[in-house]
Regions:
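Residues that mark the start of a beta-strand
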Residues: 19, 92, 166-167, 193
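N-terminal Rossmann-fold NAD(P) dinucleotide-binding loop
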Residues: 177-178
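Glycine-rich beta-strand-centered segment in the early N-terminal region that forms part
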Residues: 11-26, 37-100
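Charged, glycine/proline-rich intrinsically disordered loops and linkers
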Residues: 1, 38-62, 106-131
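Cytochrome P450 core scaffold surrounding the K-helix E-X-X-R motif
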Residues: 29-35, 104
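Short glycine/threonine/proline-enriched tight-turn/helix- or strand-capping micro-motif at secondary-structure
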Residues: 2-9
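Adenosine-nucleotide cofactor-binding segment
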Residues: 170-173, 185-197
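NAD(P)H dinucleotide-binding glycine-rich loop of Rossmann-like/cofactor-binding domains
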Residues: 69, 94-167
């Protein structure tokens, strides 16, 4: 879905999908910066630009930066074949896969916090069975959850893919890169090589 120009966020969901009632988006910082600067930091223009992207692409995939972000929302429906049996309708989750590959339809865009890359929003998103997510505890503030989850997708994928004896090289040693290096070492144990550049 990521290289696709447009995704189909139409309902109903399929049996192996999860429907999320969107509460907020956390855009990739480069995407937020590009939108803010191109709109002169004007809230109304930024809201319109984000709405235009989502309407035209069926996902939040900034065509200039190529990046997305993550979202927080409540589980609205669980497909009969969705693989996680611990979820129930109403649970609050944060996606750990990019908005650039998450089918998304917005019905409203509220306040935008450029410094935090946060966009208050309403609508729905569809998470595929392969999509990673985190179920959020009730006592964890959403702002904190988004900051943590925004970089957690990459390490989650590394943890699933890295195997003992492999050579894993991570390009970029920012927050996501360092966490990915730790995940690789955890998955491989003491065998294999972990390289960070």
């Amino acid at each position: 879905p990521q290289p696709a120009e447009r995704l189909d966020p139409s309902l109903p969901i399929r049996a192996n999908e999860l429907l999320i009632a969107v509460e907020a988006l956390n855009l990739d910082s480069s995407s937020m910066r590009q939108i803010a600067e191109s709109c002169g930091h004007d809230q109304a223009r930024m809201q319109a630009r984000i709405g235009d992207i989502v309407r035209s692409r069926g996902k939040m995939h900034n065509p200039v930066t190529g990046s997305g972000g993550v979202l927080i929302g409540r589980v609205a429906e669980i497909g009969a074949e969705f693989p996680d049996c611990d979820l129930k309708v109403g649970d609050v989750i944060c996606t750990l896969v990019s908005l650039s590959l998450t089918p998304l339809a917005l019905t409203g865009i509220g306040a935008i916090d450029v410094a935090a890359s946060r966009v208050e929003a309403s609508g729905h998103a569809i998470l595929f069975a392969s999509g990673l997510f985190a179920k959020l505890p009730a006592d964890l503030p959403q702002q904190t959850a988004m900051a943590l989850c925004d970089v957690a997708g990459a390490p989650g994928h590394v943890l699933k893919m890295a195997q003992p004896g492999q050579i894993v090289c991570v390009l970029g040693t920012g927050r996501a890169g360092l966490l990915s290096l730790c995940a690789a070492r955890q998955a491989m144990g003491q065998s294999g090589t972990v390289i960070g550049l």
